């Protein structure tokens, strides 16, 4: 009820439950990675099923990935962008499990509506560095600074975040919704 409209059909209930589980696991993994050095690793239970069933595993009996496993893969990427909504602000963390620092990266953040149109300002941070084995906030802004003026657009748009190396190759990317899913 808090994050999604409660489905009426069983099949929809299973689907929404698996999507919500994936989001919850990703949220937890990102929080653990963000809180380094106090948390230096995370395992989740359980990887796979030993018979066909709807369960909390990340991989089903037939070897198919569930939403949880896709979200865990994203959250465990060696370099990960983690935007965090904190009250009326957004803080963008860069998380790195690499053993080498990364220099001269560019972080682009643009607000887009659900039709693909740019609706807010595009923010570009150049010469971003990500030290080895770190978690750090590289950008912080008030929500109203990111969204266009006028009507309540937080429900009608999202932010795309892309981290690129000096050759223009994408190192990491993610999206941030300004409002709850439902």
What are these regions (language model features)?
Residues 1-103:
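Substrate-binding clefts and catalytic carboxylate motifs of secreted carbohydrate-active enzymes
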Residues 43-48, 94-96, 109-113, 123, ...:
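Active-site proximal loops enriched in glycine and acidic residues that flank catalytic Cys/His/Asp
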Residues 90-96, 138-140, 159-163:
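Buried hydrophobic-core signal for structured, non-transmembrane domains
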Residues 99, 116-117, 168:
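Residue-level signal for glycine
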Residues 103-107, 157:
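Short beta-strand/loop motifs in extracellular/secreted proteins, especially
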Residues 105, 121-122, 170-174:
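Extracellular and select intracellular beta-sandwich modules with Ser/Thr-enriched
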Residues 107, 115-153:
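Intrinsically disordered, low-complexity Pro/Gly/Ser/Thr-rich segments with frequent PxxP/GP/PP motifs
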